[in-house]
Amino acid sequence: MARKKGVKALLLNWRVLLLILFLIGSVVSMSIKGLTYGIDIGGGVALIAEPEKPVSKDTLNGIITSLQNRLNTFGVKDITIEAQHDPETGQSLIVVKIANVTLDEANQIKDLIESQGVLYMEFNGVIFATGTDVTVHSSDYGLDLQECPTCWYVGFELSGKAQNKFKKIAAGKLGWPIDIYLDPPVNSLLVVSPRVYQEMNSGDFMGAPSEGTPKPLVERLKEAFNITVVEYSNQTAEDIVENATALGKDKIILADVPEELYNDVRELVLSKDLKLRVSHYTPQQGEDLKDFVKRILNLYGPYVLKFDPAKGETTRLKLSGSAPTKEEALQEARKIYSVLRSGSLAVKLHVVSEEYISPTLGASFKKQAIIAGIGALIAVLLIVYFHYRRWRIAIPVASTSLFEVIIILGIAALIRWNLDLPSIAGIIAAIGTGVDQQIVITDELLGGTAGRVTRRMSALRRMARAFFIIFASAATTIVAMSFLLVYFVGTLKGFAVTTILGVLIGVLVTRPAYAEIAKYLLSLE
């Protein structure tokens, strides 16, 4: 009868009740919200992007906001975007992590990040509209089946100012080409093979003028974007770099020329520490020269002017193109729609590192992490038993550690924290810290029993001493982990968050409850 009263009193103790409430709340949280996993467990992609030039912290925050909107518009979920910025050098890095995506989706996301999203509409060498003049309405994209089964389109409207400028420069020029660019290589030196140079000056880029002669594409590029096109005729790497430097170019683009030349130019730029970006393009299998040129320039069109803008009102235009399959056509349309809808980035980003983990491999990591956690609990149970030779001590210690894990996971589900391998390592570290503190409590209680001290004040003093040690240890751990939380970006944050969470749950919830449970169990002896 006395034992039943003791159990009832224990269960009604406010410290034990608090533990029970936290456990129930955590189980409910995990059931309703569910756990979310980082890319190293759930699978996904991690990309590190670097701005093309140094930016301020405010500009960097603006880029992150635009990227978030762009990826949300694209339909991506479970996005984490973090930034590192050095105010002295201006060097910045953006870390993008996206869970639960396929390899194809990962490649599309990389393209989205590297697309600055600056739209230009040019007519005969004059830019008459940019992205700020464009309005893209919701879901105004898809397949253009009237053109072909695998053709796509993205519709948009021009502002009145851009429309008026277009009227002035295009009046009476039916059939002339309209060029639309998305992120053209502005202020670059473009060195192309003779056949590509001939293609760029051919009728493929001249439209179908009813009267007059439009400027060739090479001339339009020079006037609109300061892109200088040079025909390759056995120039050396030194000649090309010297030419680009003299013209004040930002980029050198080598198209359909020997790869050895590209390697030589790149090495020369690196050796001289020049602020020039070097890129190399070669035609893909089955790609004709017109499509190759359009890919280099990020050119859509050229479209033919089919109406006299001075005689009619039309503000709705569209980007269009084709792809090998319907699925790829829809993907391309959705990508461009996402870029235009979210707006352009302040500077262009270049992905300097990427890591993809398949969901299958992530599931294997999750299984290993679960096994490691169970192994840690069993190890705790056995070590505590061999130390005290009492199951009534070992089982509560291991159970309390399990309760801590459940509560940590419940809170993680509630705040939608992505669990990754460092986070799980933090949980295991918190278990180790918790066991240390429970041993301190147990030793104090056993010390009181060994000395046959029965007075309540003595027991309270021993508990006060134990919790002083526990709180001091917890404070030290929290301070140390706070530095990781504040000053580091990436996986170390997950370790810091779960460790701090585990320590706080321990000192505020599970440790006081364990002390009451241990006092009751030891009193039975």
Curated annotation (Swiss-Prot):
Stretches that traverse the bilayer: 16-36, 368-388, 395-415, 421-441, 466-486, 488-508
Q: Which GO terms describe its cellular component?
A: plasma membrane
Which terms does the UniProt entry file under GO BP? intracellular protein transmembrane transport; protein targeting
Q: Is the keyword Transport in the record? A: yes
Entries under InterPro entries matching the protein = SecD/SecF_arch_bac, SecD_arc, SecD_SecF_C
Q: Which SUPFAM superfamilies match?
A: Multidrug efflux transporter AcrB transmembrane domain (SSF82866)
| Localization terms from the record | Cell membrane
**In what way does this protein cross or attach to the membrane?**
Multi-pass membrane protein
Keyword set, alphabetical order: Cell membrane, Membrane, Protein transport, Translocation, Transmembrane, Transmembrane helix, Transport
> Per the record's keyword annotation, is Transmembrane helix included, yes or no?
yes
Q: Which Gene3D superfamilies match?
A: 3.30.70.3220, Multidrug efflux transporter AcrB transmembrane domain
Question: What is annotated about its quaternary structure and interactions?
Answer: Part of the protein translocation apparatus. Forms a complex with SecF.
Family in the record:
Belongs to the SecD/SecF family. SecD subfamily.
Briefly state the protein's biological role.
Involved in protein export.
What is the protein named?
Protein-export membrane protein SecD
Q: Which organism is it from?
A: Thermococcus gammatolerans (strain DSM 15229 / JCM 11827 / EJ3)
- The gene from which this protein is expressed is secD
